[in-house]
């Protein structure tokens, strides 16, 4: 049976941001097992910034990507193992290693205006026989027509699904509808569309529902919303809403609720929620993974994290520029750079 939605869990990849990329092997195994039993279609696992994302800038992981991937591949019986690669961070060699470790799905992520740098990775993924997905991050920064043109490039390179990715949790339902509509009108009928929402404006579930209503099939979500910023669309909440809409999804709602409350929430050293800092991410349109970096810079330079994030939004900063938050703090406080 073809279901109304394909549920792509991101607890073990985007959720890495919420634990500073410090999931243990035992935690990954337990969460993956619970997700598999609950019925999700795929489980994405990697450093929060994708394959090879462990750096001085992003933060190092407690384990390697391959160790995490192998753990999930061993734990699951039916769900597909997915991973993320960002060209310029992860290489084709990293992708090949991930495939050997057990990943069969890969999302190739670029900034929403830079799809052209995904060609090599998408081509390689297809050659490896992987389910290959284009992932257009910070989609709110492109107009619907411009985003659709970038999606068409990814489709041309070989992607069989392309995502609208609200990395900043900055979009409202109208924004999502316009972008999904534009992709659906531009891409081949056989090319699927996905939605990756963040909850910074408390619209993660609403935006995901809107995307499906406008033609998206794949939906990213995470247990207890575990993810950068205020988190992703909470998986258990989305599934409950899907039930109310009579959508077929293949998941056990109670099992998802139990996994969220018993396995994931206890791991949060900072609550994944909408608060003054995470709300500012969405309001200012800033990449959600900036949260921890902004809080660290704010503490060091005695400045409100919201002020840093609002200025980052004004400057149009994107993923990978987290270190520039220190520059902003120095500019705003007049501190000595020496």
Swiss-Prot record:
It is an enzyme of class 4 (lyase). Residues 5-257 form the Pyruvate carboxyltransferase domain. Its EC number is 4.1.3.39. Substrate binds at residues 13-14, 167, 196, 287. SUPFAM superfamilies: Aldolase, post-HMGL domain-like. Mn(2+) binds at residues 14, 196, 198. Keywords: Aromatic hydrocarbons catabolism, Lyase, Manganese, Metal-binding. The active site is at residue 17. The record marks 13 as: Transition state stabilizer. It comes from the Bacteria. It catalyses: (S)-4-hydroxy-2-oxopentanoate = acetaldehyde + pyruvate. The keyword Manganese applies. One of its GO terms (biological process) is L-leucine biosynthetic process. Belongs to the 4-hydroxy-2-oxovalerate aldolase family. NCBIfam families: 4OH_2_O_val_ald, PRK08195.1. This is 4-hydroxy-2-oxovalerate aldolase 1.
